[in-house]
A protein has these predicted regions:
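Hydrophobic alpha-helical core bundles mediating ligand binding, dimerization, or RNAP-core interactions
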Residues: 8-11, 31, 54, 81-83
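A beta-strand edge to alpha-helix "cap/lid" segment located at domain peripheries
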Residues: 2, 16, 52, 58-121
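A solvent-exposed, acidic/Ser-Thr-rich amphipathic alpha-helical stretch
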Residues: 4, 22-77
Length: 121
């Protein structure tokens, strides 16, 4: 049985980690080497591409954190969960969305496709 909550927590920890070395370690625990990510604004292939993409988001949204919203849905090798990106010190989220993931046989992420529900400005 998959630990979907643990996988989602690691996935969000990747997005929130500002230390590059720690983030790369988290990526290796969370994503398969040939992983793919796609949302309306970003795309990345491979763990190096995912690391570069996350760093770019940190540069665009300094002082912000991703957090999960609500329960996850899962079946077979698929996973769906909501999230939001908001300032660490409170305030309304900049972006809300839902991610759909494919989980590899080893329990790591093979792919994530993100959709935005709402974005500020």
């Amino acid at each position: 049985m998959q630990d979907h909550d643990g996988l989602i927590a690691r996935y969000l920890a990747v997005w929130n980690e500002t230390d590059a070395a720690t983030r790369r370690d988290l990526i290796a625990l969370t994503w398969v080497e040939e992983a793919r990510y796609l949302d309306p604004m970003l795309s990345a292939e491979g763990t190096d591409g995912i690391d570069a993409m996350v760093q770019a988001v940190h540069e665009r949204f300094p002082g912000h954190r991703f957090r999960r919203t609500g329960a996850a849905d899962a079946h077979h090798d698929r996973l769906r969960f909501g999230w939001e990106l908001a300032p660490e010190d409170g305030g309304p989220p900049e972006v809300r969305g839902v991610d759909f993931a494919t989980v590899a046989p080893d329990g790591r992420l093979a792919s994530v496709t993100g959709f935005f529900d709402a974005a500020q400005g």
